[in-house]
């Protein structure tokens, strides 16, 4: 068990580095659920970070976990295998998440393409975590889990548009609707047209956060505070971006430790 504990700790460190808001929200869970959540989100981060040459090997290792034939020695596979067995997780959202990493890097035409990407990544992550967050009412809470994950993915997207990959995901039809040009995008221009484009997408993220908020009473006591914290923290990221005039090309927006403590003290 010492090896498993160390494997979980390694996963926790990864989540703390790449998704500090989620890490803070997960801190309210009981230890078993918290550790399993670290393993799941570490899986997501590793898959999302893998280049196309490495992804097939990653996918093959994941298949061994699904089939209960894992013998991986790395901390991720030890922790993920243990979490997968302990909480009887299903393979489908993990497969969906990996498949989403293989998509072409072409620019998105419309909002539906961005929402589908967010569903296949963030929404899938929500479904991965659902059996960890609740043993009962999973059918009733399925949409809430998807909505939370989808919203978080959109917030992460909206908080850092500095890379070519992220710029490609801004729906071109939405840009055209508000008069934001391709030249503006490539220069990282923040003007009224960009602000309206950003807010159009942010409205979707906030609507999904609200959907999850409505279902909050259905979550068990042990996970309610985690879900509530995630909702508040990701709303706060959007508000911070607004306060800084939407300059998401130059800066990656994240909450400071002081801001996180203040937000969590109010929930």
Swiss-Prot record:
Pfam families: SQS_PSY. Keywords: Hydrolase. Diphosphate release from FPP is inhibited by zaragozic acid. Gene3D superfamilies: Farnesyl Diphosphate Synthase. Changing residue 51 to A: Loss of diphosphate release. Changing residue 164 to A: Loss of diphosphate release. It catalyses: (2E,6E)-farnesyl diphosphate + H2O = (2E,6E)-farnesol + diphosphate. The keyword Nucleotidyltransferase does not apply. Disruption phenotype: Loss of biofilm formation. Loss of a dark-orange pigment from cells, alteration of cellular lipid profile. Significant reduction of proteins found in detergent-resistant membrane (DRM) fractions. Decrease in membrane fluidity, about 30% decrease in protein secretion. Changing residue 47 to D: Wild-type diphosphate release. One of its GO terms (molecular function) is hydrolase activity. The keyword Hydrolase applies. It comes from the Bacteria. Its EC number is 3.1.7.6. PANTHER family: BIFUNCTIONAL LYCOPENE CYCLASE/PHYTOENE SYNTHASE. Belongs to the phytoene/squalene synthase family. Monomer. A farnesyl diphosphate (FPP) phosphatase. Involved in biofilm formation, its disruption blocks biofilm synthesis which is restored by exogenous farnesol. Releases diphosphate from FPP, was initally suggested to be a squalene synthase. Diphosphate release is higher from FPP than geranyl pyrophosphate (GPP) or geranylgeranyl pyrophosphate (GGPP). Biofilm synthesis is partially restored by exogenous squalene, beta-carotene or retinol. Required for integrity of cell membrane lipid rafts. This is Farnesyl diphosphate phosphatase YisP. It comes from Bacillus subtilis (strain 168).
């Amino acid at each position: 068990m010492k090896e498993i504990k160390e494997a979980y700790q390694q996963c926790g460190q990864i989540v703390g580095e790449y998704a500090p808001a989620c890490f803070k929200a997960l801190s309210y869970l009981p230890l078993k659920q918290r550790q399993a959540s670290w393993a799941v989100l570490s899986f997501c981060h590793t898959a999302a970070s893998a280049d196309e040459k490495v992804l097939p090997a990653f996918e093959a290792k994941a298949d061994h976990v699904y089939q209960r034939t894992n013998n991986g020695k790395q901390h991720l596979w030890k922790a993920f295998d243990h979490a997968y067995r302990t909480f009887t997780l299903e393979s489908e959202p993990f497969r969906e998440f990996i498949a989403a990493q293989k998509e072409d890097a072409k620019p998105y035409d419309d909002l539906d393409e961005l929402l589908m990407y967010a569903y296949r990544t963030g929404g899938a992550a929500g479904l991965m975590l659902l059996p960890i967050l609740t043993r009962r009412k999973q059918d009733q809470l399925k949409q809430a889990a998807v909505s939370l994950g989808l919203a978080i993915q959109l917030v992460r997207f909206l908080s850092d548009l500095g890379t070519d990959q992220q710029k490609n995901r801004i729906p071109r039809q939405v840009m055209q609707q508000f008069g934001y040009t391709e030249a503006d995008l490539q220069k990282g221009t923040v003007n009224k047209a960009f602000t309206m484009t950003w807010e159009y997408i942010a409205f979707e993220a906030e609507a999904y956060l609200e959907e999850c908020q409505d279902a909050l009473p259905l979550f068990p006591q042990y996970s309610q505070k985690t879900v509530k914290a995630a909702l508040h923290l990701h709303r706060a990221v959007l508000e911070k971006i607004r306060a800084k005039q939407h300059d998401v090309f130059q800066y990656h927006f994240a909450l400071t430790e002081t801001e996180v403590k203040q937000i969590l003290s109010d929930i």
